[in-house]
Amino acid sequence: MSEEHLIRHCAPTLAGLKTGSLFSCSFACQQELLNVLRQMNHRLLPKGVRVLPLRLSDNRALIYVYRPKKLSSDIADTVAEQILLRHGYDTAVCEKCIVRLIQRIRSQEKFPHEIGLFLGYPPEDVCGFIENKACNCKCVGCWKVYGDEEAAKRKFAQYKKCTEVYRDRWATGTDIERLTVAG
């Protein structure tokens, strides 16, 4: 996992625009990957960003980059809380939700669709996705939209622009700590 992976897949999270981001990467040695994650957390935790492996298998890692404060706020939403409670989450503590998400990812063949709540997707869109089995959405961008289509399109454009700006700034030498907004 490289800084480039983080910039390419997580710029809106690093910028403080999004609760979390998820990406997959390959690794040759699990211990080396865990060392890189430790180093990245050492650099990003002071800015309020955490990096976790949700799953490691067959030299592939599913990496979750998130802002714990934003996640705590997001899961306090009434609709989000109802979705999580239905799937066995203890919503009182953010860290317990992360542990439950990891359990669900590692133990199920089907991907847990409530993960959208951990990525900052609107709860009505996550609920719509689950209830409609990923069909009948209003539009598709970073996620499938079932609620406010115009607000979602604005977010998609904002995330795209942020990623472009971050990629350009990183390519010209701005380090990841400088690109990560404290929060």
Locate each region found by the language model.
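A structured, charge-rich N-terminal accessory region that forms the first stable segment of a protein
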Residues: 2-57
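Short, surface-exposed beta-edge/turn micro-motifs
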Residues: 18-20, 59-61, 112-114
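Short helix/loop capping segments that flank catalytic or ligand/cofactor-binding pockets
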Residues: 33, 73-74, 127
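A glycine-rich, hydrophobic loop/mini-helix early in the fold
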Residues: 37-93
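Short acidic alpha-helix initiation/capping motifs at coil-to-helix transition points
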Residues: 75-77, 103-110, 133-134
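Internal catalytic-core helix/loop-beta-alpha segment
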Residues: 86-113
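Hydrophobic/aromatic-rich, well-ordered segments within soluble, folded domains that form packed cores
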Residues: 111-139
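Long, compositionally biased
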Residues: 142-183
